[in-house]
């Protein structure tokens, strides 16, 4: 029977699964290797669960027999992924009382990094809501949750000794002229509980403290940290960036960031701190007397050399805590240091980023906006900014993080990452609507070798997964022109 799947361009897609569809597994992401057998399994009781040293730590082997399932894994990660696959097979079996085929699944991820980013800086997401998002991530074997905690529109991390982060930086008067105040800040305990919740599901949490730009909320709270303090600065109420950068010549700035990094160390055991580093116009550094004097003293030729010095000092602060930095890649490899990790995000620059980061000795995570930015509309006509192109499910699925390059040219690529920016996504419902089902495609891009991936097979599986997610998480992944959650802002700026 044909199964409807409304996913592209607002058009209801219908297709007929192949005749042997009942003799296939519906696993997303597609396993590395699947060997099906003639027998049928009507129970998936876990009969054995063993660690096998011959398997890699993130690999597993799941054997389905008529009597039940046997799991072998190389370590904790592999066991988590094997149990995730077993969970999906049980969901499939629940809808197929005639049974599913027996077989052997031998599996491991193509890339070690498979992440999603949420943006509570723009719209605060309560920690309790994030747990549902995390559960769905784990179902699809994602292993990194990136929290964009600070930006022009809000600051969400508490830092001892800096009370105005909560009283000023975490609040704004409205969003896009809607007249509705918005605020929110996590407690330290909430963040620790979220980290533990994620860890139990094989997910590390990566905090981001954006710098030296994207800091209008910080400027509103502590204007003395900036080159030209503006005591009347407000937390930004619209999208976009400001030209205000923290002043690297002020000791109080480094005292503040040392406190921030100490707090992150106590909360996030991953040891990774994303520092942003993107969209940082240096015109005020050029004009700042303190910065000009520092450049002259150090014989710096321009503000980009000052930017390099800024991040060298920041990296040194992190190193004292055993932490390492990550950045949004801006193409100027000179401000990064060999061995550091950057995210390729700028539209149309993926191939260039792969080549330049390889030459510079950097690790790369593929987050190319035309494939990976899940806040972009997924159906033509959905509301967002006018400049955003529609990124369909198939466009996301077409992503090869290596862009066809061989291992010797792309071996520094660590994985794939999909941000869900939230300037116009006010709550979990909007966040999930934009993230799924495209996150399923990103999951397969990060996990599955190109040789086992198939768009047609993915569409077949996704029809089943709509039912799996509906029953397990009470969430419908159907996407049509008319079922987008109500959109508060009518302007398109």
Swiss-Prot record:
Class of the enzyme per the UniProt entry, highest EC level: hydrolase
Residues forming the catalytic site: 151 (charge relay system), 214 (charge relay system), 279 (charge relay system)
EC number(s) recorded for this UniProt protein: 3.2.1.52
Residues that, per the record, bind Zn(2+): 227, 247, 288, 291
Biological process terms in GO annotation: chitobiose catabolic process; glycosaminoglycan metabolic process; polysaccharide catabolic process
Thermal dependence summary for this entry: Optimum temperature is 37 degrees Celsius. Retains more than 90% of activity after 96 hours of incubation at 37 degrees Celsius and after 12 hours of incubation at 42 degrees Celsius.
Gene Ontology CC, one term: membrane
Single annotated GO MF: metal ion binding
Top-level taxon: Bacteria
Activity regulation statement: Significantly inhibited by the addition of sodium dodecyl sulfate (SDS), but not by EDTA, urea, 2-mercaptoethanol or Triton X-100. Strongly inhibited by Cu2(+) ions, in case of which the activity is decreased by 70%. No significant inhibition with Al(3+), Fe(3+), Ca(2+), Cd(2+), Mg(2+), Mn(2+), Ni(2+) and Zn(2+) ions. Strongly inhibited by PugNAc (O-(2-acetamido-2-deoxy-D-glucopyranosylideneamino) N-phenylcarbamate) in the sub-micromolar concentration range. PugNAc at a concentration of 0.5 mM decreases the activity by 50% and the addition of 1 mM PugNAc fully inhibits the enzyme.
Activity vs pH: Optimum pH is 5.0. The activity drops sharply below pH 4.5 and above pH 5.5.
Keyword Nucleotide-binding: no
PANTHER family recorded: BETA-HEXOSAMINIDASE, BETA-N-ACETYLHEXOSAMINIDASE
Primary role: Hydrolyzes terminal GlcNAc residues from terminally unbranched N-glycans and from chitobiose. Hydrolyzes beta-1,6-linked N-acetylglucosamine and beta-1,4-linked N-acetylgalactosamine from pNP-alpha-GalNAc[beta1,3Gal]beta1,6GlcNAc and pNP-beta-GlcNAc-beta1,4-GalNAc substrates, respectively, as well as beta-1,2-linked N-acetylglucosamine units from the non-reducing end of N-glycans. Hydrolyzes GlcNAc residues linked to alpha1,3- or alpha1,6-mannose branch, but has low activity on substrates with more than one GlcNAc residue on one of the mannose branches.
Name of the protein described by the UniProt record: Beta-hexosaminidase Amuc_2018
């Amino acid at each position: 029977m044909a199964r409807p799947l409304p996913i592209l361009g607002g058009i209801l897609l219908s297709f007929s699964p192949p005749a042997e569809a009942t003799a296939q597994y519906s696993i997303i992401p597609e396993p590395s290797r699947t060997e099906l057998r003639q027998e049928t399994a009507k129970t998936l009781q876990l009969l054995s669960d063993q660690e096998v040293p011959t398997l890699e730590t993130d690999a597993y082997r799941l054997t389905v027999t008529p009597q039940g399932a046997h799991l072998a894994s190389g370590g904790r990660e592999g066991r988590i992924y094997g149990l995730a696959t077993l969970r999906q097979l049980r969901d499939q079996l629940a809808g197929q009382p005639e049974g599913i085929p027996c077989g052997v699944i031998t599996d491991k991820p193509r890339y070690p990094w498979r992440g999603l980013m949420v943006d509570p800086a723009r719209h605060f997401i309560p920690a309790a809501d994030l747990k549902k998002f995390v559960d769905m991530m784990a179902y699809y074997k994602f292993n990194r949750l990136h929290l964009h905690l600070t930006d022009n529109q809000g600051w969400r991390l508490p830092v001892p000794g800096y009370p105005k982060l909560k009283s000023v930086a975490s609040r704004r008067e409205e969003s896009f002229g809607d007249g509705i105040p918005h605020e929110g800040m996590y407690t330290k305990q909430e963040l620790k509980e979220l980290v533990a919740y994620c860890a139990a599901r094989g997910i590390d949490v990566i905090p981001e403290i954006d710098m030296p730009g994207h800091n209008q909320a910080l400027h509103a709270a502590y204007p003395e940290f900036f080159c030209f303090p503006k005591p009347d600065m407000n937390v930004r109420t619209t999208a976009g960036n400001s030209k205000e950068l923290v002043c690297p010549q002020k000791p109080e700035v480094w005292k503040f960031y040392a406190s921030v990094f100490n707090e992150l160390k106590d909360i996030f055991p991953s040891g990774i701190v994303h520092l942003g580093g993107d969209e940082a116009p240096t015109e005020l550094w050029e004009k700042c007397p303190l910065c000009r004097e520092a450049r002259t003293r150090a014989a710096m030729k321009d503000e980009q050399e000052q930017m390099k010095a800024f991040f060298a000092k920041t990296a040194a602060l992190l190193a004292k805590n055993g932490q390492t930095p990550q950045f949004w890649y801006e193409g100027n490899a000179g401000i990064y240091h060999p061995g550091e990790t950057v995210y390729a995000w700028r539209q149309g620059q993926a191939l260039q980023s792969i080549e330049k980061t390889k030459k510079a000795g950097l690790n790369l995570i593929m987050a190319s906006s035309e494939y990976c930015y899940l806040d972009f509309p997924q159906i033509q006509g959905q509301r967002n900014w006018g400049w955003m192109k529609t990124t369909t499910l198939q466009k996301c699925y077409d992503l090869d993080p290596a862009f066809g390059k061989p291992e010797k040219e792309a071996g520094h690529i660590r994985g794939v990452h999909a941000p869900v920016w939230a300037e116009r996504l006010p709550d979990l419902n909007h966040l999930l609507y934009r993230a799924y089902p495209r996150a399923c495609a990103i999951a397969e891009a990060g996990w599955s070798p190109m040789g086992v991936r198939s768009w047609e097979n993915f569409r077949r599986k996704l029809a089943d997964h709509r039912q799996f997610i509906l029953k397990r998480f009470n969430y419908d992944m159907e996407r049509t022109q008319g079922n987008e959650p109500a959109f508060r802002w009518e302007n398109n700026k």
